[in-house]
Swiss-Prot record:
GO terms for cellular component: mitochondrial inner membrane; respiratory chain complex III. It comes from Ziphius cavirostris (Cuvier's beaked whale). This is Cytochrome b. One of its GO terms (biological process) is mitochondrial electron transport, ubiquinol to cytochrome c. A ubiquinone binds at H201. Component of the ubiquinol-cytochrome c reductase complex (complex III or cytochrome b-c1 complex) that is part of the mitochondrial respiratory chain. The b-c1 complex mediates electron transfer from ubiquinol to cytochrome c. Contributes to the generation of a proton gradient across the mitochondrial membrane that is then used for ATP synthesis. PROSITE patterns: CYTB_CTER, CYTB_NTER.
Amino acid sequence: MTNIRKTHPLMKIINNAFIDLPTPSNISSWWNFGSLLGLCLIMQILTGLFLAMHYTPDTTTAFSSVAHICRDVNYGWIIRYLHANGASMFFICLYAHIGRGLYYGSYIFQETWNIGVILLLAVMATAFVGYVLPWGQMSFWGATVITNLLSAIPYIGTTLVEWIWGGFSVDKATLTRFFAFHFILPFIILALAAVHLLFLHETGSNNPMGIPSDMDKIPFHPYYTIKDILGALLLIVILLALTLFAPDLLGDPDNYTPANPLSTPAHIKPEWYFLFAYAILRSIPNKLGGVLALFLSILVLLFIPLLHTSKQRSMMFRPFSQFLFWLLVADFLTLTWIGGQPVEHPYMILGQLASILYFLLILVLMPMASLIENKLLKW
């Protein structure tokens, strides 16, 4: 008799995705981030659900309801900080996952890559609306500044901003709708992640060498299930260490002050995972130009498969491209640092140079390096 996992309609799907899935035998730990992102998403949904049971999306009570969760709800403090720091872990895994895709040429699977970019945008939107919910100073002013950017859109800008706000400023209506968005988006992300996986399993996984691995595949279980469990344990240990020893390390102290429309914080800045895009936004003196650059800093990922000029898929055997890749990583970190600094000399000029380099590397230098490498190899 055939095993039930191979015949049952539901079990069959799980079996083909996580148990009997043929997987390249040589994928490294950089391939762990997919499962870690799944784990992060499940953790965020669960902690978020418990937070939503006690949170009130109203301008008068939002801040105090978060304080109530931390002080009066059983283990509310750990649920809140797991959720806040879980978002940071989520983005660390996301950026590592994207970096892996860039380095090893995983973007050649175009459908998987494009859905991944949509997923990134959805996660960023979720994190942004979520940051507004505690209704601290940085929540309020972050929401005001970022939503206000849409007013740069010609003709419809102002109307659009007021439509999103539900009034003439960030107020009760804004907070309520942001809570609704923050609740629904993770479930949309979950569905998109399933589609992401569906497209990946159409082609099978890439591998570090970027060559076909059909002749050398092993079952996902037990080899990669055990490897994923190790990755998950490491993630949980790091998250718990962050949550229990330094819960506010990555947060902003301004968010412990209740929102006050009459007093602007000295330095308005988003959470650390948006700082690179914020630095690019601030580098351009024109409002509309800045907004376009902000969106392009993410959407540029969609052009990467079209700009692949190398005859090889992976960067494993391409030293020029490797150098430019790590330069891009350094540039990303530089932008992240600049985004958290005040708008003054020398940070402004550094930010502008880093922003130019960011787009130059992705759109010009990396495709050119690939062509040079092809020539050197007489391909």
